[in-house]
C-alpha cells in the first residue's frame, strides 16, 4: 500500500468532538509510510478529511481544531428548524483554508451529507468546501439545515456514517474505515448534549452493517470522551 497510495482509501466517520481521534489514526498511518489516495468523511470526519486532503499535517489540524467554538451562544437562532446556526463552521473552514473548491484538494476528497426532505445521500466531490462541510456537520435538531441548490441538507451520518461505499465508487481498492462510535456517553448537562447523545446513540445502532463493506475498520479507544469534548 505504501508503494501505490492510489489503492488506499480512508473513510472517516462522524463523532461530534470525538473527531480529533481521527488525527491519531492519520498520524499512525504516516508513521507506517501509508498515505491515502482517496479520502471521504462524514460530519466531524469530513472536517478532518478536508484539512488533511488540503495538505495539513495531523498535529497542525489538532492545533487548528482547538480554535473551533462550534456551540457558541452567539450562534443561537430562533428558527423552528434548529437551535443553532452552523455558519461558524463555514467561517472556520474559510479562515484556515480559504474559499477553496473540493476538487482542488491534493488528495481526491468526498464529503457526505443527507437531504432531510427525501432521505437521500448527497455526496460532494466538487464545489465549495465550506458549504459541503457545513451540510455534513449539521446535526438535525441542533443546527438548522444547510440550504444547497434548493435542498435542505443535514449531517451525513444519518445515511452513511463511515462512508465506505463512497470510497469504492471513487476507485479505492483497499478501503479503511474509522468508526468513532465506541466511546460511550456521558450524562448530558444541556439540551444540546441531550440531542447529541440521542443522535449518536441512533447512529451507533445502525453502523455495524456499513463496516461490512470495509477491508479494515479501525475503532479508536474513546472511553471517557464526551461528544462535546474538543
Regions found by a protein language model. Give the residues of each.
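Patatin-like phospholipase
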Residues: 1-42, 50-230
Amino acid at each position: 500500500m505504501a508503494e501505490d497510495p492510489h489503492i488506499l482509501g480512508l473513510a472517516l466517520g462522524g463523532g461530534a468532538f470525538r473527531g480529533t481521534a481521527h488525527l491519531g489514526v492519520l498520524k499512525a498511518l504516516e508513521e507506517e509510510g501509508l498515505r491515502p489516495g482517496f479520502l471521504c468523511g462524514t460530519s466531524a470526519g469530513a472536517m478532518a478529511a478536508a484539512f488533511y486532503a488540503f495538505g495539513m499535517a495531523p498535529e497542525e489540524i489538532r492545533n487548528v481544531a482547538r480554535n473551533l467554538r462550534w456551540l457558541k451562544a452567539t450562534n443561537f437562532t430562533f428558527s423552528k428548524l434548529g437551535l443553532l446556526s452552523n455558519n461558524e463552521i463555514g467561517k472556520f473552514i474559510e479562515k484556515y483554508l480559504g474559499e477553496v473548491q473540493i476538487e482542488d484538494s491534493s488528495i481526491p476528497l468526498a464529503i457526505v451529507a443527507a437531504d432531510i426532505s427525501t432521505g437521500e445521500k448527497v455526496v460532494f466531490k466538487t464545489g465549495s468546501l465550506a458549504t459541503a462541510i457545513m451540510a455534513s456537520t449539521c446535526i438535525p435538531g441542533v443546527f438548522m439545515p444547510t440550504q444547497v441548490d434548493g435542498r435542505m441538507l443535514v449531517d451525513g451520518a444519518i445515511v452513511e456514517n463511515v462512508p465506505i461505499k463512497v470510497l469504492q465508487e471513487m476507485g479505492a481498492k483497499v478501503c479503511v474505515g474509522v468508526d468513532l462510535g465506541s466511546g460511550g456517553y456521558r450524562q448530558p448537562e444541556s439540551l444540546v448534549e441531550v440531542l447529541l447523545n440521542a443522535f449518536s446513540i441512533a447512529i451507533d445502532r445502525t453502523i455495524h452493517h456499513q463496516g461490512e463493506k470495509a477491508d479494515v475498520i479501525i475503532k479508536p479507544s474513546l472511553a471517557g470522551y464526551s461528544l462535546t469534548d474538543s
